[in-house]
Every structure is written in C-alpha cells, then in structure tokens.
Curated annotation (Swiss-Prot):
Described function: Could have a role in patterning the central nervous system during embryogenesis. Has a key role in regulating the distinct phenotypic features that distinguish two major classes of ventral interneurons, V0 and V1 neurons. Regulates the transcription factor profile, neurotransmitter phenotype, intraspinal migratory path and axonal trajectory of V0 neurons, features that differentiate them from an adjacent set of V1 neurons.
Keywords of the record: Developmental protein, DNA-binding, Homeobox, Nucleus
SUPFAM superfamilies in alphabetical order: Homeodomain-like
Compositional bias segments (type: Low complexity): 314-323
The protein's name in its UniProt record: Homeobox protein DBX1
MF terms (GO), sorted A to Z: DNA binding; DNA-binding transcription factor activity, RNA polymerase II-specific
Gene Ontology terms: biological process: cell differentiation in spinal cord; regulation of transcription by RNA polymerase II; ventral spinal cord interneuron specification
Subcellular localization(s) per the UniProt record: Nucleus
Gene3D superfamilies the UniProt entry points to: Homeodomain-like (1.10.10.60)
Amino acid sequence: MMFPGLLAPPAGYPSLLRPTPTLTLPQSLQSAFSGHSSFLVEDLIRISRPPAYLPRSVPTASMSPPRQGAPTALTDTGASDLGSPGPGSRRGGSPPTAFSPASETTFLKFGVNAILSSGPRTETSPALLQSVPPKTFAFPYFEGSFQPFIRSSYFPASSSVVPIPGTFSWPLAARGKPRRGMLRRAVFSDVQRKALEKMFQKQKYISKPDRKKLAAKLGLKDSQVKIWFQNRRMKWRNSKERELLSSGGCREQTLPTKLNPHPDLSDVGQKGPGNEEEEEGPGSPSHRLAYHASSDPQHLRDPRLPGPLPPSPAHSSSPGKPSDFSDSEEEEEGEEQEEITVS
C-alpha cells in the first residue's frame, strides 16, 4: 500500500518528470501508469481538477487575491487537504466534487503547476516568488525560466560564490614584512673591537654579568656581544684546529673534559720562543713540554720578587695528571699577569 502524502518527492522533480500537460490519457492508461506516477504532485492535481480544465490556461485576473493579503498558511493547508484525497479518488475511480472552483483556483495559484507553468505571469511573478518558501526548492533541477528565482534568492548579485584570486591580499602582505628573528650585521668601531678582543683574551667564554657590563660600557646590545663572542670562538677554534692537526693533536683538546679540565686557551701565534704551550692529552707524555710549562711563570714574574724553587726531577720527568693540571693553571695565571702588564 502506498502513501503519497507521506512519501511525496520535493517540488523540484515535477519539472523533470512531468508529462506533457496537453496530453490527456484515458482512464485505462492512467490506471496502467499509476505505479510510476502515484508519487507525483502533478498527477494528483490533474486528477482532482475537472476533465475539461487545461493546466496552462490560468486567467490573470484570478491572480489578484495574493495582493489583497491572502495568507500562505491557508494555501499550504489547502494543498494538504487537496493532496490527501487524491489517492482515494483514484482508487474509487470518481473525481471528488466536494471542492469549489474558488478553492481550486486558490490552490492552483500557489501550486507547483502554476509556478512552473510557462504561461503569462509577468504581473504576479513577484507575489508568487515572495509567497513560496525557499526551502521547497533545495534541488538544482529547474527549468530555464526558473533560474532568475534561484539567482535572486540563493545567489545574489552582490555576493560572489567563488572569490576572485586577486582579492586575497594576505599573501602579498606577508611577503612585504621583514622576517622576524633576523638581525642586521653589526658594524663595530675600532675601540669596540679592541675592547672585545681584550676581553676575549681574558676569557673565551664570557659570563652573563660580564657580558652585560661590557655591552653597557661599549654601547652595544647584549645579543651583539654574545654573537661576537660566538663568532670569535669559532674562528679561534678553526685556527687552533689547524695548529693541532699540524702538530699531531686534535680539536677536542680545546674543550674542557674530565681528563682535561683546564684546556689550553691560548691564541695561535702569540707565544715567544720560550713560551711554548703544552699539548695535553692522556697518551702524549713529553718531558720537554712539561719542563717548559712549569718554567713559564718564571719569565712573567717581577725580578724584584724571589723566584720560585726549581722544579724537582720527579715533577719535570713525570707526565702524570696532577702535574698537567698544575701546569695548565700556571699557564692561565701567567696569561692573566701578562695581560695586566700590557694594559
């Protein structure tokens, strides 16, 4: 058993599946096609109207009541009242006669047939378009004459569905802005460069308080002093690596480790003939280097002060770890004293 009132399709399908309005089929053919057209609103409307009624001959004079305030709710109830007895009238075989012509014209004015018909409706098209709710036309299957309604309600001319690519201005704005985090290369004066180099000779790794004091003294930013020390350490390590590789050492000897807590931090090419540095390493014992390392402070002390005791044979000959640590400490003290006297 079919329920046309419950399973009625949307209003967009009659425009595609609607038969030719001028074609009138006999009652036997209509009963033969009842299985295919029982769900069409157009068939229900055609059954309920008189046989001699033509669907496209709606008079324009009868279209004036919507302007006088005919409510849409009444037409909707009328459509439901007229749509429900349609199947019963088809099953009974006799068209209903309880409806008046006024109710039929009122229903047909707001029905699907009146809206989709291509008859003269220039006077009543604004009223019909305002009375029909937009939700009943959710499918895009419409005739060519119905496209202006779709454009006016769903696709207004003021708003474009697909935006133009040229309207996007945020990629161009992002290109024009400078990248964050990039600092310009600082240009240091001779006084600033000399002061930075002097501090670098004292300590390769400057502490944060000393760095802030030096930056405030030279009129620089803390980040500029930090970056300068990083670049200077990298340059120093590269030159130190070349020297160590030429003498058979490695670059890791300049880094503080457990076996080498006080690495050699002296610059390349700044030592005299008697001020040679000690190549510290776990497997590089050298009697001559240990002796020169222990005798480095003798060249830097004041001649008025009594000199230190001469190194013992055990100290000069043994390449053990304690002697290496003491030698490196004496080297650092000697460098600091030399810098103080020069300044």
